[in-house]
Structure formats: C-alpha cells, structure tokens
UniProtKB/Swiss-Prot annotation:
It is found in: Cytoplasm. Mg(2+) binds at residues 44, 83, 115. Its EC number is 2.1.2.11. GO terms for cellular component: cytoplasm. It comes from Clostridium botulinum (strain Alaska E43 / Type E3). PANTHER family: 3-METHYL-2-OXOBUTANOATE HYDROXYMETHYLTRANSFERASE. The active site is at 182 (proton acceptor). The lineage of its organism: Bacteria, Bacillati, Bacillota, Clostridia, Eubacteriales. Binds 1 Mg(2+) ion per subunit. This is 3-methyl-2-oxobutanoate hydroxymethyltransferase. InterPro entries: Pantoate_hydroxy_MeTrfase (IPR003700), Pyrv/PenolPyrv_kinase-like_dom (IPR015813), Pyrv_kinase-like_dom_sf (IPR040442). NCBIfam families: panB, PRK00311.1.
Amino acid sequence: MKNTIATFQEFKNKGKKISMLTAYDYSMAKIIDESGINGILIGDSLGMVIKGEEDTLSVTVDEIIYHTKSVKKGAKNALIVSDMPFLSYHTSVEEAVKNAGKMIKEGGANAVKLEGGASVIKQIKAIVDAQIPVMGHLGLTPQSVNAFGGFKIQGKSEEAAKRLIEDAKLIEDAGAFAIVLECVPKKVAEIITKEISIPTIGIGAGNECDGQILVYQDMLGMFDDFIPKFVKQYANLGAQMREAIQIYIGEVGEGSFPQDKHSFKIDEKELQKLY
C-alpha cells in the first residue's frame, strides 16, 4: 500500500515508528521499497556518496530531479521525498516554489525537504500553499557546514536547544508534515517530538523520535570514507562486493569464466558452413 504524508501522521498518532532510507537509483530503490520501507529520501547526500564530493553543496536541482525519476520507477509504495539543494530555495520565495514544483512535476516526488528554521519559514509556507508537502530539517544541516565550521552536533547548550525547539514549532506552524532532526542530543529530540504534533525523523537524534533515516551506503557498509557515530552497519557489503569482484577478476584471468552454461550455441550444421 502506498505510503503518504497521512500515513506518516497516522504512525505518529498510533505510536508506530517510521522507517526511511536514502536511494538514488532504480535498482536500489526497488530493493529498499520491496523491503517495506515507509519513505525514501533522494538526498543531497548524493554529492558525497555518488559524486565523491567532500560535502553536499555542489548538488543541483537537475541532479536531484534526475535521481528522483530513477527512484520513482523502482519505489511503488514508499513516500518519495526529494531534497532541495543548497541555494535552490534561499534566494527568494518565488525561486523556492519554482524549484519545489520542478521536483514534483518533473521528478515525480511526493514531497520536498529543505533545511533551516526561522530563516526559511516564508519559503515553507509558500511551498505548502502551492500544494506541495514539505519536510523540514533541523540540527546539523549539511548545507550549513561552512557556517557551522564543520559537521558538528547541534543543540548542546540551553540557548541552542531552545532555538531548535522554537524552530521546530515554527516549521510545524508553517505547514510542514514532518521534521528531520540530525545530530541533536537525544533528550532535546525527545522534547521536540513531544511538543509538536507532526512526526520527527531522527538521524543521530536518539530513539525517541517518531522515525529514523540513514544513508543506505552507511548502514550497509558500502561507504567507508567516513562512518558517523550514529550509524549502525547492518551489513558489510563493501567487503563482500570487493571479494566478489576479485573472484571475478581471477576467473577471467584464468579463463574459467564464462563456462559453457554462460555461453550461447550455434547449430552444428550452421557452424560447419563457416569453415
């Protein structure tokens, strides 16, 4: 059954946990979707895990749309959420609505996600008014990595925690259907989760959030350039993939692959005509 923003709200109301993962292509989206995930985020994290960049800042709207199209074809039941990249909504309300609309109309997303608190409330309201569901994002917002001075936990002081709580309430009032809380102290995330009526999706924010999200390469052990503290690796596919590829290389080198069962045959009579 197709997950919707109503499904997410129903889960929160009933105390059921929401599960989300990232995806960027058809094949992986299909596997994730068939596993029963509630939501898939086409994250600007693709800048790091797909493009090999050091951060997410270079990702463009067109790149998000391209990957959203691929994910959409593979995921039939998950809620599809597309990240709004750096500077795709910051410059003006009009630009924010235009780019959000492109992700829905051209990419096929069900919703968009954007980072920030009080500074982006006008954008959130305008996008919601355009009938586009919005997921907020507070805490460690990767697009603000330069402003934060690196990838650091947020909300550790009383002042910073109060600001996060207030921002969460503002985002809810603006009409967002959910909020991602990234790298926020567990107790602060718990307070936010209790004080707002929309779902919170945690990533490095403890288990009191209404749901969780991870980058699939992280949780499957496929990306070892950097492993965040909040990641649990449920498999070590990177090592398994390298081993499989090395076996393939060895079999090609010794001529044991392909075998007859991997090859096609020609009728013996037709073959004789070639000599």
